[in-house]
């Protein structure tokens, strides 16, 4: 990227330097971190950026937990702490958990760590790393009379990439994000969504001199101008469902399975967006996996794609309905009000008619068993209809099953040129909803579930 006005990469004339702070002791609960750093780095100057490993903050703040020395017992305690510090589990692989912790940070094991601590201890993250950064900054100003920025870091993995890097989990005294929106590069291109996580870049750069084995938990970045804007590391966290990848693959699949049926609802108002034919074909393919008696295929979905034929069918059904309602003694106003409820089938982008066909049905000499056979085939069609509605919902397509053709089977068969033994079982309006589908909570079964 060509430097633009306000580029985050500006450095002083002396260049950018990263300096280790050596000679620090092992930190224990109750230690004064500011006092120890001030003693080890009296050369700190205004404008320096102090980058501090979170572990020394956590130790000093008493976030150390006793643990057994036995490896298996120690791991059991560690896993219990991981669950304790987590608010949700995003992914798991073997014993490894990727969690969102109470700080909103997504990382392995909720930040619970057993490295660089005694073998009979485990350490948690600081309870409030931003507050810790602010307190350390104030403590150094009091002891050395300098204004420095502070970044508190922890090591994290990254999606899509091997290896780990340090990232900021606490910050004070600097702008943690640099927003390039509205800036123009050297070729005249306006930048729109580029935000640079400056605090994370500082954390990663400082780790080049801190390392993991040399006992150097603090480094100083010198020569990078900073601007204090009140932001903290909490501003780096993209929370929950705002993130495009807020669940692991297996967890996303599991959630999708749980919510698939709950996405279905009766949609009666549709957007103008056309539904791709392949989307409907795919949903029908799913629907045809529904259970059926005697290994038969008792359902056919008639897709009324010809607009004129649909108009003729719906008009003929409306006339039949009016005649039935007149025979019931309803006045014209009530009749038109009832018929008007069927406008959804005129307005829907697509309409499908589910039909029960008797292919493979058994014949019985008595009325009781023959009625049971008919019921069995009808139930199978209902299962396929539900499968279709759910399959459409999982693709973001709305639908509404309406019983209309059940009351006008002869008219439906005549207008659609269907065989005499095809029994239409309603109509399904299909189209994209005007509002995105969302799963609704399951109902309390109440008297819907009877246990014996």
Curated annotation (Swiss-Prot):
Binding site for GTP: 24-27, 54, 59, 116
Binding site for FMN: 264-268, 292, 403, 440
Matches recorded under InterPro entries: F420-0_g-glutamyl_ligase (IPR008225), F420-0_gamma-glut_ligase-dom (IPR002847), F420_FbiB_C (IPR019943), FbiB (IPR023661), Nitroreductase (IPR029479), Nitroreductase-like (IPR000415)
Keywords per UniProt: GTP-binding, Ligase, Magnesium, Manganese, Metal-binding, Multifunctional enzyme, Nucleotide-binding, Oxidoreductase, Potassium
Catalytic activity: oxidized coenzyme F420-0 + GTP + L-glutamate = oxidized coenzyme F420-1 + GDP + phosphate + H(+); oxidized coenzyme F420-0 + FMN + H(+) = dehydro coenzyme F420-0 + FMNH2; oxidized coenzyme F420-1 + GTP + L-glutamate = oxidized coenzyme F420-2 + GDP + phosphate + H(+)
Region called Coenzyme F420:L-glutamate ligase, residue ranges: 1-248
Amino-acid positions noted as binding a divalent metal cation 1 in the UniProt annotation, renumbered to this chain: 113, 154
Cofactor remark: Binds 2 divalent metal cations per subunit. The ions could be magnesium and/or manganese.
GO BP term, pick one: F420-0 metabolic process
Molecular function (Gene Ontology), one example: coenzyme F420-1:gamma-L-glutamate ligase activity
Alphabetized Pfam families for the sequence: F420_ligase, Nitroreductase
Dehydro-coenzyme F420-0 reductase: annotated segments: 249-452
Family classification: In the N-terminal section; belongs to the CofE family.
Name of the protein in its database record: Bifunctional F420 biosynthesis protein FbiB
């Amino acid at each position: 990227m060509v430097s633009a006005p306000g580029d985050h990469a500006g450095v002083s004339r002396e260049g950018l330097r990263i300096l280790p702070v050596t000679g620090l002791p092992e930190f224990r609960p109750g230690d004064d971190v500011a006092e120890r750093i001030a003693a080890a780095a009296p050369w700190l100057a205004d404008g320096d950026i102090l980058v501090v490993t979170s572990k020394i903050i956590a130790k000093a703040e008493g976030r150390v937990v006793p643990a057994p020395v036995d490896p298996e017992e120690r791991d059991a305690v560690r896993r219990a702490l991981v669950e304790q510090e987590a608010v949700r589990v995003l992914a798991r692989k073997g014993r490894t958990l990727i969690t969102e912790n109470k700080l909103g940070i997504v990382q392995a094991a909720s930040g619970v760590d057993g490295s660089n601590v005694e073998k009979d201890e485990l350490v948690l993250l600081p309870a409030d790393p931003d507050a810790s950064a602010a307190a350390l900054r104030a403590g150094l100003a009091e002891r050395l009379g300098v204004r420095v920025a502070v970044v508190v870091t922890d090591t994290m993995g990254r999606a899509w990439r091997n290896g780990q890097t340090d990232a900021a989990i606490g910050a004070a005294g600097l702008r943690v994000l640099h927003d390039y929106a509205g800036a123009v590069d050297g070729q005249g291109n306006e930048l729109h969504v580029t935000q640079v996580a400056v605090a994370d870049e500082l954390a990663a750069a400082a780790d080049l001199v801190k390392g993991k084995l040399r006992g150097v938990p603090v480094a100083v970045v010198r020569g990078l101008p900073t601007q204090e804007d009140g932001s903290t590391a909490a501003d780096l966290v993209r929370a929950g469902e705002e993130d495009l990848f807020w669940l692991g693959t297996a967890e996303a699949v599991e959630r999708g399975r749980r919510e698939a049926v709950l996405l279905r609802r009766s949609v009666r108002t549709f957007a103008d967006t056309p539904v791709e034919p392949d989307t409907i074909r795919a949903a029908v393919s799913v629907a045809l996996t529904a259970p059926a008696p005697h290994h038969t295929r008792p359902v056919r979905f008639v897709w009324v794609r010809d607009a004129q034929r649909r108009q003729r069918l719906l008009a003929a059904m409306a006339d039949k309905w009016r005649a039935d309602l007149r025979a019931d003694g309803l006045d014209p106003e009530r009749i038109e009000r009832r018929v008007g409820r069927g406008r959804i089938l005129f307005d829907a982008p697509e309409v499908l008619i589910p039909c029960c066909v008797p292919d493979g049905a058994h014949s019985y000499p008595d009325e009781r068993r023959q009625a049971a056979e008919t019921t069995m085939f009808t139930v199978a069609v209902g299962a396929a209809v539900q499968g279709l509605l759910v399959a459409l919902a999982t693709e973001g397509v709305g639908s509404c099953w309406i019983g209309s053709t059940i009351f006008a089977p002869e008219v439906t068969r005549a207008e659609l040129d269907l065989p005499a033994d095809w029994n239409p079982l309603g109509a399904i309006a299909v189209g994209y909803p005007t509002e995105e589908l969302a799963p609704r909570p399951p109902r309390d079964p109440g008297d819907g579930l009877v246990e014996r």
